[in-house]
Amino acid sequence: MEAFVVRGGRKLEGTIRVDGAKNAALPILAASVLTEETVVLQGVPMISDVRKMTDILTMLGCRIRRDGHTLTLDAGGLNRTEMPDALSKQIRSSIFLLGPILSRFRQATVTYPGGCEIGLRPIDLHLSGLRSLGVVIHEEGGVIHCDGGNMHSGEVHLDYPSVGATENILMAAVLLPGISVIHNAAREPEIVDLANFINAMGGSVRGAGSAVMTIEGVKRLHGVQWTPMPDRIVAGTLLAAGAITGGTIELTRAPVQALLAVNAKLREMGCDVREEEKRVILTAPERLTAFAQLQTQPYPGFPTDMQVQMLALLSVSEGTGVVVENVFENRFTHAGDLNRMGARILCSGRTAVVRGVPELYGARVTARDLRGGAALTLAGLKAQGETQVDGAELIDRGYEHFETQLTCLGADIRRVHANA
C-alpha cells in the first residue's frame, strides 16, 4: 500500500496546466475500436485507469503504442469479444467496451465491472438501452452475454440521464443502419467530447449536450487524431486546494464552461474566481465562509465527483453548511476521517450537516475511493501537523502524479510505502 504524507500550513500558489480528462479519455479509448484504422490520441492522462483500459484493449487484440501522453491505437486486428475477467473487475470503465464490440462483431461478453466503492452503480440502464437496439442479453454468474445478431436502430428512453449508459448506447448505435434516438440523455461535457470524436471519425451524432441525442448510422468510421478535453474534476480539485489553503491558483488549459457550477460555490465561500479563455484564476480569503447548501445533480448541476472535496472545504469554513448527495447513496464515507482530523460533520442518509471549525489536525486516514482520497489530501494541506493518507494508489486512478502537482504549487507532500 502507498500513502501520501502531508505537512499542512502552506498556502498553495502558482500556475498549473490541467491534464486530459479521465472521464473523456476512457470512453474515447473504447470508441477507438469502432474503426479498423489508426487512431492517435494526444494529451491522454497516464493514470492507472487508463493503463488498465489499454491492457484490456491489448488483450482483445488491439495494438497500442505509447509515447509520453500520446497513444497510437490500431484495432484492425481486434479478434476477441470476451473481455478479460480479472481486469474488467478492476475498472468500471471496462463496461464502455460493450457497445463498441457489439457494434463491430455483433456479440460481446463482459463480467460485471469494478471501480470505486461509492454506492450502487447498476448497469441496468446500459443493458435496457442495448435491448432497445435489438440486443439479446443473458446474465449468468456475474457474466453478461450479449447477442447482437439482430441489432437495429431504435428509440431509447433512459429512466435516468446516466453518463455511462448514454455513452454505451451512442457507441453501439453509430454503425447501425437508420436513425437511433436517445431520450433523457446525459448532458455532461465528456459526452459532447465523445460525440465530437466519433463525428471526426465520420460518424453522424447530433444533439450531444442536450437531453435528446440523434445518431444516424454510418457504414464505417475512419482513423483520426484527437485530444481529449481537459479534466474538470482535476481542475476543480486544484482550485479547491488553493481555496482551502488561502492561496492563489491559476489554471491553464482550463475547461471554463464545465467549471461554472464549481466556481459558483467557491465564490459563495468568499473566493475571487476569474474566468478567462481557457484560464481560471482563484484567490482565496484567509478563511472561507460556509455556503448554505450544496446539492449534487447531473450536469450542468454541481458534480458529485467534487462533493467530498467541498465537504473538506466546508469543514474549515466559518458557519454551517449542508451538503445533499443526490447521485450516489454512499458518498459520505470519508466524513469519519475528516471528523478524526477535527471536523464536525453529521451525516444522515444523503445529507451532511457541517459546522465549520477553525483548525484541522493531522491524523492517519484512509482513502476509500479516488475523490475521497483527494479530499483527505486537501484536508491534510490545511491541517496542523502531519497527515498520512493511506491508499494513494486509489487517488492514482484519477489524478496523474497528484503529489507532484501539489508540490509544484508549494505543498509539503511526499509518497511513501505504508504498512497496513
Regions inferred by a protein language model and the residue ranges of each:
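Short, structured segments at the rim of ligand-binding sites
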Residues: M1-A420
